[in-house]
Amino acid sequence: MAPPSVPIVYAGGRGGCPGGYHGLVLYVPRGLLEETRAHLLREAPKEGVGLWAGRREVERVIPLPNVHPSPLTAYLADPLALLKALKALEREGLSLLAIYHSHPKGPALPSPRDIKEARWRVPYVIFGTDGVRAFLLPEGQEVALVVL
């Protein structure tokens, strides 16, 4: 996986705007970006999946098991692990900032399945063979990734 091709984000904005996007930008420290990349490389050739959480920027990477029946070409976060992670975030006062997953053999673009199955109103961060990008789905609007 190549380095990011675009500047990473948050639902809340770096300068304020609690609860909303500020200029459609997601901020992620380089170390957490690399931690995410390492998780996804360990999952290859399967698609990996996880969450980014924090307040004004990504503060935590939460890998989740991919329980999809076809994990080489799709992902489905384990529902129980997802629920436990979301409850822990709530207890800790952190917000879900993004859902990440990998396309180990394809580009960092939403697949038709990614678009069809999008349910969460947070950016979907996709790590592909050509880098990493983030999108609001199903609309397809790109979210800038600012690496700190």
UniProtKB/Swiss-Prot annotation:
One of its GO terms (molecular function) is zinc ion binding. CDD domains: MPN_like. Keywords: Hydrolase, Metal-binding, Metalloprotease, Protease, Zinc. It comes from the Bacteria. The keyword Metal-binding applies. A motif (JAMM motif) lies at residues 101-114. InterPro entries: JAB_dom_prok (IPR028090), JAMM/MPN+_dom (IPR000555), VirAsm_ModProt (IPR051929). Gene3D superfamilies: Cytidine Deaminase, domain 2. Binds 1 zinc ion per subunit. The keyword Protease applies. It holds the Pfam family Prok-JAB. This is Probable TtuB-protein conjugate cleaving protease. It comes from Thermus thermophilus (strain ATCC BAA-163 / DSM 7039 / HB27).
